[in-house]
């Protein structure tokens, strides 16, 4: 928790200091009230006291009350500002750090867990700071100040109060020791519930199609019940705290008055003034003792929240302190243009026992088309994911424009690439916003938008929309078909006017006619652009300048369609499974 608080900005620190000053003032006025109460008690029990003097003391007490209330309001405002400002800063840092993470780090944490840490965990921190600035600071100051005030009044009464404080401290520590491990369990269960819910909602159509509602409900019910039972155990412990505190506070008040009565009885009946003074001290002592108890009650409220906040802080720090394996280089310019080269590249996924890719070497030049084909799981997507550095090669070098991709600045490398993912991803917003997504050196004009949509073969359905390119796309593109999503994803890559286009099985959702028109348009209008196409269809790749055939992570064939039909059995088998010998001739 302290490690996280060290990230607080100067503005938040200043507001926290001001809040502390206001708390000091508030405590001063609160603890001044019993002194006036002593004077008032003495006046009421002393013959000949003037009404004006009594009213004067009463007005001073009213002034202290109003001043304390005003300072409390100011402290509440500042604590809320501090907490919200700090949570905003941490949320920004956390989100930006997550955005810098590579695929490896994302897999280690999981998306539902990262969402929980960015939302729920930060809310826990915000609550503890807001409450803490008002209570954690106020409680010990008030308790210590009140103890100092009562120390010289009666050692017997002080001993009773001290005994109560010790008992409460032991009780609170026991509750915290029991509850903190359970809060960690609750946070992990929250991640699990988010994961199951996200999986269920994302695949809701599949769930309905396979009549799997009961199975999914049972799957969700297990972590949900575990969370309920764990939280109930904690709530039972917390339910004991306030009654115990109330019983203790009332018992302490009763003990003070009983002991005070005993002490008063021991004073001689003739010493009336001494009895009045002692009675006044008992009343004031009871008030101060109540302040001590109230301080501990406030601390108890914080301690009820603190374990969850502590776990949340650990989870946030875990993400912020996670090193990103993909480090940015310093090169901002390539030696060539439009070239991609793999030199003896091997790759192994983290924690895997075998290589996913083994000793891959090839080079394509500006304007050429490279196709990659192979069975499912042969490593096609893995191979092209090394170009934009979703992962880094375990061995060998991946070069773009003659420079190792590890040496490039991220902006420089990404500006050279137009990447179309295997699974089309669209974002909530208009078609125009999706096509011109991200930062690019390419102009964002209506003409460029039209060209990208035409070339991607998306014009057919975009022109039919009432709002055209201003038509709003829902989250993840749920209001357009798979083929439409794929074409808009391709338009997004084309709008960047990159040197190198990478298509990761991006034509799979297109019909054969649209596929052919798209490839024809790419060859005609983007003759100088290097194209890398991962595909399953022979018809999509047969006219490529170079085709790589992958099998279990190894390049078992490389050449043109005609060359591979002659000397690569794997390619020939794939080709004949899709087209007849006459069609392949």
Short names for language-model regions:
Residues 335-585:
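ABC-type nucleotide-binding domain
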Residues 11, 15-28, 32, 130-186, ...:
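Transmembrane helices of ABC transporter permease
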Residues 14-36, 57, 61, 76-80, ...:
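Alpha-helical segments in transporter systems
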Residues 10, 100-104, 120-129, 133, ...:
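An intracellular "coupling" helix at the cytosolic face of ABC transporter transmembrane type-1 domains
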Residues 50, 149-163, 233-314, 319-320:
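Helix-loop-helix
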């Amino acid at each position: 928790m302290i490690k996280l608080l060290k990230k607080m900005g100067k503005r938040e620190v200043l507001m926290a200091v001001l809040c502390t000053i206001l708390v000091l003032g508030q405590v001063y006025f609160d603890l001044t009230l019993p002194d006036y109460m002593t004077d008032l008690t003495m006046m009421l029990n002393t013959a000949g006291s003037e009404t004006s003097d009594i009213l004067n003391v009463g007005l001073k007490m009213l002034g202290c009350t109003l001043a304390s209330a005003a300072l409390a309001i100011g402290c509440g405002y500042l604590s809320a500002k501090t907490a919200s400002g700090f949570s905003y800063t941490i949320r920004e840092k956390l989100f930006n750090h997550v955005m810098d993470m590579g695929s490896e780090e994302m897999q280690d944490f999981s998306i539902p867990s990262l969402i929980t840490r960015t939302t729920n965990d930060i809310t826990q921190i915000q609550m503890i700071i807001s409450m803490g600035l008002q209570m954690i600071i106020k409680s010990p100051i008030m308790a210590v100040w009140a103890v100092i005030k009562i120390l010289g009044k009666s050692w017997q009464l002080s001993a009773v109060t001290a005994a109560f404080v010790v008992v409460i401290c032991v009780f609170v520590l026991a509750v915290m020791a029991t509850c903190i491990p359970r809060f960690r369990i609750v946070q992990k269960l929250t991640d699990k519930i988010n994961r199951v819910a996200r999986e269920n909602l994302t695949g809701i159509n599949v769930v309905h199609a396979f009549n799997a509602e009961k199975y999914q409900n049972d799957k969700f019910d297990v972590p949900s019940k575990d969370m309920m039972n764990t939280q109930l155990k904690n709530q039972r412990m917390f339910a004991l705290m306030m009654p115990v505190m109330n019983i203790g506070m009332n018992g302490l008040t009763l003990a003070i008055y009983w002991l005070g009565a005993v002490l008063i009885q021991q004073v001689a009946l003739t010493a009336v003034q001494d009895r009045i003074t002692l009675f006044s001290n008992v009343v004031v002592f009871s008030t101060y003792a109540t302040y001590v108890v109230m301080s501990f009650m406030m601390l108890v409220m914080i301690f009820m929240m603190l374990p969850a906040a502590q776990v949340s802080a650990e989870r946030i720090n875990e993400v912020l302190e996670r090193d990103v394996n993909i480090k940015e280089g310093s090169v901002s310019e390539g030696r060539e243009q439009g070239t991609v080269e793999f030199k003896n590249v091997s790759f192994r996924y983290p924690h895997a026992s075998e290589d996913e890719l083994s000793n891959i070497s090839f080079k394509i030049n500006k304007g050429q088309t490279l196709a990659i084909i192979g069975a499912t799981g042969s490593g096609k997507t893995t191979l092209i994911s090394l170009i934009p550095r979703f992962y880094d090669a375990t061995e060998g070098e991946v070069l773009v424009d003659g420079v190792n991709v590890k040496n490039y600045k991220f902006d420089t490398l990404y500006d050279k690439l137009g990447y179309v993912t295997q699974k089309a991803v669209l974002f909530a917003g208009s078609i125009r916003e999706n096509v011109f997504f991200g930062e690019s050196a390419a102009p964002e004009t209506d003409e460029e938008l039209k060209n990208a949509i035409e070339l991607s073969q998306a014009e057919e359905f975009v022109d039919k929309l009432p709002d055209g390119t201003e038509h709003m796309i829902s989250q993840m593109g749920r209001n357009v078909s798979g083929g439409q999503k794929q074409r808009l994803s391709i338009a997004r890559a084309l709008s960047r006017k990159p040197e190198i286009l990478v298509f990761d099985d991006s034509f799979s959702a297109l019909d054969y006619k649209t596929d052919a028109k798209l490839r024809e348009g790419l060859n005609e209008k983007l003759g100088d652009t290097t194209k890398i196409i991962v595909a399953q269809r022979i018809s999509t790749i047969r006219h490529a300048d170079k085709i790589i055939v992958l099998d279990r992570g190894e390049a078992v064939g490389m050449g043109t369609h005609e060359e591979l039909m002659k000397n690569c059995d794997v390619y020939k088998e794939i080709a004949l499974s899709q087209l007849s010998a006459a069609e392949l001739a």
